[in-house]
Amino acid sequence: MSVAENTDGIAVPDEEMLKRHVAAEATVKSFHYEKPTGGKSAKGRVNLGKSDNIRGVVQIVKKAGGENNLHYHTNASSFWMVLKGRVRFYGPDDKVIGEFGPHEGTMTPRYARYWFENIGDDDLEILQVGAYGDPENDSSGRTDSSPQRYQIHTSDRYEGVVEPKK
């Protein structure tokens, strides 16, 4: 697989690269996020989209409950940004990493131990964009470092709207 340049310095893909372009372009998706209503769990997840090496999710953490436990991921780094509410992130020994409000956040690299909780007066809506280190492995490699406060597999799960509002 190679890319040659024409005389104008423009990349000209070979046949294999062109196949990759076409395959990738066939999976481009748009989305629109709206907070779901009617969830019964203390936590919800709205899946916005994913590819082989990146995932986008909005986590909704209700005021009473839904906080997670100290953990890390062996196969994913995450970028976190608060959309609504307030969050406090902690590291080992409950050391505060930071408190964040709308349009603020943090980045947690692979193997960094952390947990977070909703510290606002309303539900927390937080965007998580995860970059996966091994595209062949669909798991983030979540590994608990302390007992779970909230059973993560009991959260309400939703799919984001694929076509954006017009």
Mark where each language-model region is.
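Conserved hydrophobic/aromatic beta-strand scaffold that supports enzyme active sites
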Residues: 30, 58-60, 79, 105-107
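Short, conserved beta-strand element in jelly-roll/cupin
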Residues: 59-63, 72-89, 129-132
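A short hydrophobic beta-strand segment most commonly corresponding to one strand
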Residues: 79, 107, 121-140
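Short acidic-glycine-tyrosine-enriched beta hairpin
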Residues: 94-110
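Short, charged beta-turn/beta-strand-edge "cap" motif at the junction between a beta-strand
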Residues: 112-115
